[in-house]
């Protein structure tokens, strides 16, 4: 399931009329370039690339050139678009859910520390803390729902297709119902991380920032980037394919 994208593959798969979610689905390494331009490819992944460029006065040709010329060593080593759905669900848990759980204690420690030390001179830090706590609690409640309810059902759909049998009816009726809830929670988490980015002026350090301040901002920015890819894999690949598979069966 691993595939290194060649320049030829990249160039022939990008179109201005594709949604930004579809573009990143072709190569998750494109996410870094979209991040640079503030393009929302996860919660807002269903909007066309050209529409976003026009709305935000971005040079579409320049961005496409950057995508097409991405060095091969930076290209994605996973072809997520063609992952088995069960494997993709497992990947999300193993990589992204693990990342969240491992990083929360560190962010808790550092963010609370700089609020105590620098909060008087930088009151915006308390807004950062409030939004971080909101996204933290959202994710800690959200991930078990996926791990214990939605993802096991996706595995059952995959098994049903492989064995040419009808899947047992789930208690939630259709996969669209938990997916709708997961997407709403993704939106909430995405809004909170946007607030953090705005409050920190894109994670710009103040002149009096200490090493703890720097580490905190690095942790928060990495947390945001991982969350964007995490949500993208679900909203733009896993969820639509799970809905299509259930309808097919």
Regions found by a protein language model. Name each.
Residues 3-249:
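Small-residue-biased structural context
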